Amino acid sequence: MERIKELRNLMSQSRTREILTKTTVDHMAIIKKYTSGRQEKNPSLRMKWMMAMKYPITADKRITEMVPERNEQGQTLWSKMSDAGSDRVMVSPLAVTWWNRNGPVTSTVHYPKVYKTYFDKVERLKHGTFGPVHFRNQVKIRRRVDINPGHADLSAKEAQDVIMEVVFPNEVGARILTSESQLTITKEKKEELQNCKISPLMVAYMLERELVRKTRFLPVAGGTSSMYIEVLHLTQGTCWEQMYTPGGEVRNDDVDQSLIIAARNIVRRAAVSADPLASLLEMCHSTQIGGTRMVDILRQNPTEEQAVDICKAAMGLRISSSFSFGGFTFKRTSGSSIKREEEVLTGNLQTLKIKVHEGYEEFTMVGKRATAILRKATRRLVQLIVSGRDEQSIAEAIIVAIVFSQEDCMIKAVRGDLNFVNRANQRLNPMHQLLRHFQKDAKVLFQNWGIEHIDNVMGMVGVLPDMTPSTEMSMRGIRVSKMGVDEYSSTERVVVSIDRFLRVRDQRGNVLLSPEEVSETQGTERLTITYSSSMMWEINGPESVLVNTYQWIIRNWETVKIQWSQNPTMLYNKMEFEPFQSLVPKAIRGQYSGFVRTLFQQMRDVLGTFDTTQMIKLLPFAAAPPKQSRMQFSSLTVNVRGSGMRILVRGNSPVFNYNKTTKRLTILGKDAGTLIEDPDESTSGVESAVLRGFLILGKEDRRYGPALSINELSNLAKGEKANVLIGQGDVVLVMKRKRDSSILTDSQTATKRIRMAIN
């Protein structure tokens, strides 16, 4: 205040004003400051005084031929003076106006293509809906957000190669376009931008916007997808928010959202299989999202979510060094600890072995709806400052922090036994046992925690055990703050390892992630997710399992048939039959399996009883561990559509229907593909015609390797011997004839020889 008074005083004296407005600036330091270097020191001032001059713009000499000296109003458009220090002319801003009105018009066809991101944004805003403005305190936390809607997910290097190839194809320099997306984009853009007159540099800038994800660390309350971020300045102020619904979708947000859903489904499914890590990798490699391979998306997409990070870790990619517990992302900001195993007793006198972190540490905790700062010592919570959207969210954060603190009074607050299991029916580790227990009911925990008197601190209030705010008292060490805690800003990625149970550890052995941390939230993906792996057939329910199992058999029929005759056990153990077992009533699975295996054995033994349709129909039932019994079945039950439906052993049923004339198979009324029976099956004759050009030598001889299918025989050299599988599921040894002349007689002798070889 004093300074301002003093200045006001000075200004009121006329001499002061005169000195300030009239004196020349000739102090060397000041001149140096404003004249050294190419960088403009005060651009807005420069612009203002330039525009006050008559001819502030310089232009190429050609302008004098294209623009008249004066406009209709007789104002001069350019000066005959040439610009000092260059051979350009001095031009008035009026010349620009004249040019815009009367200058030549070029083709505009490329503008929407080059400035695609802008045109798209206008469309989104045109179709977006702005709702009412609400005045309320905004809890904003800084998060790393995508500020560039509608981009592909190329790395900076990949994008650079694409841009050089599209915009400067003749420039020297090695450019390697390897990824599918790079090639597609390059081809597409080259076609779009043929004969484009827009300056190459501008095109390059715009392409970069389309190809690369740009992120900024911004204060956000509410939606974080790029479509919301582009209108951040319209939707949230310091004390107000405006509702907004985007118009249209952008691919990158859809990819992020669908990737999270696919990763969660895959991790949940892998966790219950016999070898979770192998299964997870198999699924990631065989899944497509919106037509792009999931593994390609994982390599490029920086989304940080528990399931996505587990998939990345499995692929050997680096991930963020923060760890996850109870759905919150923890980042240690100071301190350190060592781990030690300790046995503790719950309130129910159950013994738990927990890994205790000894030492003082500080963490930030960031969740979807709440954030916190946690300071803890060995098995003691020192301080927790929480902020969240509502009481429920604040309570969730408090429970997670208290469990994480490992305090004794938390463990003593357990009532009843802890026996939570994961999806694979394995017991959860003790920390997750405790977490689940209190997430179900935290009343005792909050009641026993203890309360304390609090000092009045700006922006902080106390919170009572029933989660109501108070200015006098609070749960011990816990306060609620109006300010959020910023997300961890670093984009640093670390090398991690993953074990077969999908637990991800950093190089010091700390567990960063595990399947228990994967959210159970179900959502609907915005892009089509295609899971080719049999493990994911269940995701769309029992019908999908049924159809997919039979389609898989038909697609792989040639190899299935050979395995069926040579190594049935290996065939029955194939993972593709695993999902099907959940459809067969548990009590009878074993009997069905024993029955079908016996039936198949007869097919192998008795000439002429081989039946393609029946074999395909019954094969999935043979996969369960068989129980030997004398039971015969005329139909087998599967649980679909909420009840048991029957598959007839001989003949068609609504579940499995094969039309001999059209060769089409329908499963539950849905077309499942074409099924080609072996040529002579209906007459149960011999495939002699197919064996023309081959001499049948006798029974199968294992020394000549696994049986070939009829189709594979054509690859044999003359005189070469091989085992071959003929129509009835029998295997015989054949030799390719050395001469073609005797082919005719083959058909007659084949029939006799096969009978002899088999019997």
From Swiss-Prot:
A motif (Nuclear localization signal) lies at residues 736-739. Disulfide bonds: none annotated. One of its GO terms (molecular function) is RNA binding. Keywords: Cap snatching, Eukaryotic host gene expression shutoff by virus, Eukaryotic host transcription shutoff by virus, Host gene expression shutoff by virus, Host mitochondrion, Host nucleus, Host-virus interaction, Inhibition of host innate immune response by virus, Inhibition of host MAVS by virus, Inhibition of host RLR pathway by virus, Inhibition of host RNA polymerase II by virus, mRNA capping, mRNA processing, Viral immunoevasion, Viral transcription, Virion. The keyword Flavoprotein does not apply. The record marks 627 as: Mammalian adaptation. GO terms for biological process: 7-methylguanosine mRNA capping; cap snatching; DNA-templated transcription; symbiont-mediated suppression of host cytoplasmic pattern recognition receptor signaling pathway via inhibition of MAVS activity; symbiont-mediated suppression of host gene expression; symbiont-mediated suppression of host mRNA transcription via inhibition of RNA polymerase II activity; viral RNA genome replication. InterPro entries: Flu_PB2_2nd, Flu_PB2_6th, Flu_PB2_C, Flu_PB2_CAP-bd, Flu_PB2_middle, Flu_PB2_N, INV_PB2, PB2_helical. It is found in: Virion; Host nucleus; Host mitochondrion. It comes from the Viruses. One of its GO terms (cellular component) is virion component. Its main location: virion. Belongs to the influenza viruses PB2 family. Plays an essential role in transcription initiation and cap-stealing mechanism, in which cellular capped pre-mRNAs are used to generate primers for viral transcription. Recognizes and binds the 7-methylguanosine-containing cap of the target pre-RNA which is subsequently cleaved after 10-13 nucleotides by the viral protein PA. Plays a role in the initiation of the viral genome replication and modulates the activity of the ribonucleoprotein (RNP) complex. Influenza RNA polymerase is composed of three subunits: PB1, PB2 and PA. Interacts (via N-terminus) with PB1 (via C-terminus). Interacts with nucleoprotein NP (via N-terminus). Interacts (via N-terminus) with host MAVS (via N-terminus); this interaction inhibits host innate immune response. This is Polymerase basic protein 2. The lineage of its organism: Viruses, Riboviria, Orthornavirae, Negarnaviricota, Polyploviricotina.
